[in-house]
Amino acid sequence: MAVLEIVKHPNEVLETPCERVINFDKKLVKLLKDMHETMLIADGVGLAAPQVGVSLQVAVVDIGDDTGKIELINPSILEKRGEQVGPEGCLSFPGLYGEVERADYIKVRAQNRRGKVFLLEAEGLLARAIQHEIDHLHGVLFTSKVTRYYEENELE
């Protein structure tokens, strides 16, 4: 496994919708492993492929609970319910945090590393992290959804 360089804003790859994954091969498995390692070393809870310069619909999420690592390939949100408002940051925007409204519950359809379709239900922080990463895959940045920015001392 390798730690990848995280793309910082501004960069065109962050604002470009990603291509769907067609080839479920060893290159994809390596990308997933490298992304997960990169996310953990950077102390993140999610990482999307465009954040490492790869314009594919691939994301990894791990919020540090017993859900563990979630790999999302070609994900789409089928259902959203409720709302939550809270702080978000992004590894591509170091030191920038803002308040963002997200659905509190989501149901997602995605594929695993072998191409098998699965459904996932999530709520709370996990739902927030997944929505943030899926936005990345469509070229949507969290800064476009911020209702107010936080000073660093507000987050302590």
UniProtKB/Swiss-Prot annotation:
Cofactor note: Binds 1 Fe(2+) ion.
Pfam families, A to Z: Pep_deformylase
Tagged with keyword Metal-binding: yes
Gene3D superfamilies cross-referenced by the UniProt entry: Peptide deformylase
EC number: 3.5.1.88
Protein's UniProt keywords contain Repressor: no
Catalytic reaction annotation: N-terminal N-formyl-L-methionyl-[peptide] + H2O = N-terminal L-methionyl-[peptide] + formate
Protein name as it appears in the record: Peptide deformylase 1
Gene coding for it: def1
